């Protein structure tokens, strides 16, 4: 059974909180970020800019940020996008939880991994109740 925690994303400060999911002491989003080739660093900076806009409750183009679903149990899936990068997460009552990231070329596989982590995390919350 995995142990989950949330860690605040210090670079994002706004009306909404932005956290990243930590699984068994490792953060999938940090691992994604650290594995990026240098040519994609500017795209990731752009995604951080859109995260800040969302945290500040500003309007963001649908092509850069959108929800995937209507939400179950008050939790909705979302995606931040750039030309080559994707960042996946879910909503929480006072903000967003970033779960993982990926590239456009592998997005099918990475969406499956995102949903697997999301479901495990949500199941862990239900066990705590």
Model-based region annotation:
Residues 17, 28, 74, 104-105:
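Polar low-complexity intrinsically disordered regions enriched in Ser/Thr and small residues
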Residues 18-21, 76-80:
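Generic recognition of long tandem-repeat/solenoid scaffolds
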Residues 38, 53-57, 123, 127:
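A structural signal for alpha-helix termini and helix-coil/disorder junctions
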Residues 52-79:
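A short, surface-exposed loop/turn module that caps and links secondary-structure elements
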Residues 1-46, 129:
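Arg/Lys-rich, positively charged N-terminal/basic patches that mediate binding to nucleic acids
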Residues 1-12, 78-86, 90-129:
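Enriched for short, Lys/Arg-rich terminal
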